[in-house]
Amino acid sequence: MLSLSRLRALQIAGFSVLLLSLPGIRVSAQSSPLDKQVSSVLPDAQTLYLDLHQHPELSSHETRTAAELADRLRTLGYEVTEHVGGTGVVAILKNGPGPTVMLRTELDALPVEEKTGLPYASKVRTKDDSGRDVGVMHACGHDIHMASLWGTAAIMARNKDSWHGTLMLIGQPAEETITGANKMIKDGLFTRFPKPDIGIAMHDTNGLPVGKVGITPGYAKANADSVRITVYGKGGHGAQPQTTVDPVLIAARIAVTVQSIVSREIKPGDAAVITIGYIQAGTKNNIIPDDAQMGFTVRSYKPDVRQHLLAGIERVAKAEAMAAGAEKMPLVEKYESTSAVFNDPVLTRHLAATLEGVLGKGSVVTEDPIMTSEDYSYFVEQGVPSFYFTLGVADPQKLAEAKASGRQLPSNHSPLFAPVAEPSLKTGMTAEVTILRDLLQGTPADVKKFTQQQAGN
């Protein structure tokens, strides 16, 4: 692990030089008040980032991470509550009457052994919930999110004349297992604390260069449902299949037939994916087993499409079992799910214009929705109009070279994922402060005008 003095040296000798030398990063001779405010907290935000990066913790085990964030927010004057929904953190800063706006960060890291070669790379190893020895890494950039949120929190606390209302900061555990948001809600997140008028969340991406942010009006992330099917047959000798009911063959037929649900039952233009990640059965090549297991991930955006896919999978599984003469119908279990993240279109358009006015023309990029999932959707389902946006963290030159050669930079969840930290933090804090100051004005009714429901669209 690096000492704090060494962390400081890295910031000054490495990150600051990197910020000045990266193509596409402009350093203005004249700084705005917000630029100066961001610069004033940047060294401490970098220290926090490097510390978090070296001390990653797995989902639902973020005890050190949560305590570190809570202590720092408490020092800034926030009213902090810990252990919400497990290791969750809620920090409230009241600044007179006005709207309530929520800003969320995730706390957890991934069971990935870091291979970036960075001087501050994680060397943490631990046991996961199944007892396996695993490396641990912030391979999804949640350390960038936390450090940005802390810097934003500091600027908002030190410049209370620029906004009014209630700022609600959320440190959410277990995003990677899509369980943390729901646990916080069940633990009274919106009953023990003010229910926000607007919710904000940011996620980093190596698909955009530093200095740019991405927005997606409407559906941004997909419904995600995990389905496990146990197919029951009748085992026997592989040389005498006529005495058996082969569950492997039934599973194979299910695997093929379910694809027709997408291609023949879902309207063209409605996104839908059924992927089978595993079929497991048997112990020996000449033994037909008694059963087989299949694992599915099912993705969609629209609620009706989601229900059609899930019902169709169960229908196909039972039909194929009946066709094979199975005496026992398959067991179909949905064991892990989260809904789509929906960005309020009116709010998104408003904040996109606001961000471009501060970050510069061309800095806001409209992105297509993607089929990955995010349990921030649980907050949206509670009736919180939201804006979920992406933060570019890629070296502009490396990204351009990769695109020119038809390659992609190491993405989130890769052991090589390495955001360009200082400019990413700077843009992240600038974007978050800009959004919060824009929304934390007027009355709750005023801020609701920026949402689809109140705009009547």
Tell me the role of every PLM-derived stretch.
Residues 249-457:
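Metal-dependent amide/peptide-bond hydrolase catalytic core
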Residues 11-26:
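Bacterial N-terminal signal peptides
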Residues 1-7:
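N-terminal secretory signal peptides that target proteins for export/translocation
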Residues 52, 73, 91, 103, ...:
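Divalent metal-coordination and catalytic microenvironments
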